[in-house]
Amino acid sequence: MIRQVLPPSVEQLEAARRVIADHLIATPTITLSLRGRPVLVKMESLQPTGSFKVRGALAAVDAARRDDPNGAVITASAGNHGLGIAYASSVLGVPATVVVPKNASAAKVKKLGNYMIELIQFGSSFDEAQAHGMALAEERSIRFISPFNNSDVIAGQSTVFDEILLQAPELEHLVISVGGGGLLSGALISRDAHGRADIRVTGVQPYESAALYHVLRGASMAEVVHRPTIADGLAGGGDDGSVTNDLIASHDVPLLLVPEIEIRRAVREAAENNGIVIEGSASASYAAITNDLVDDATSRVGFIASGRNISLELLLEILQEPLA
């Protein structure tokens, strides 16, 4: 049963900004040339865990600690949110359990093993891992922290957009990769708070696993078909009752679908042409821009390099693929 969650309050937004300022860097927003077009790139891949998700994790674990200084937390994750919870656990001193599916990225599982957490591999999908994590939370009477359906997590993710506005006020259109919708929801909340409705926001999902895209068109999560994708951080995910669904629907955000082959090409192009390593989840946004899926040829466009946690084996495989 999905617990009803409200959008973050002003107090939650302020608390998230404080704990993130104490423990994380303000990642730079740089300009890269994507097939000759200057594009603003928010380098969240430079975070200590290699992903923006550490922001929401820090905010949520900090909130749990303030509510119960002697408590513990548990989460389910495809990898990056789990790394964020593990990092937050280490710096805030809160015991944590992370449940990941058995097919989670080997690179992310290896990094999780470096933290003093309880790591559980369960199920063949994020949804199965999440169900197990929620059952354990109830059994142990500890807090479950969803990667997206959590107001403190969304508050933490909103700080990405806060920083972009300070670093690149000229931004006119931001493209955001979407799984459960935590980052997109955070960006929308920040945009509203700063009175920047002039900035367009577009979401991107992998064609092979686009739960939110279909749910916002009337499907239930159970009806959505998921196929393998290298954008593993966007795969599966989503809850029928998630607050992110309502936030995104109320802002009428367009969602685009990107084919798997273009996500793979974007990983390669980012490395070969721009010298940056980004995982498939971030590459979905890159691909949407470079393949002209974003209907905006003149605006100052940007995207979030949301993570770098791709295995060396997969990266080498993609780099060695013949160019079509």
Predicted regions and their residues:
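PLP-dependent amino-acid enzyme catalytic core
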Residues: 1-324
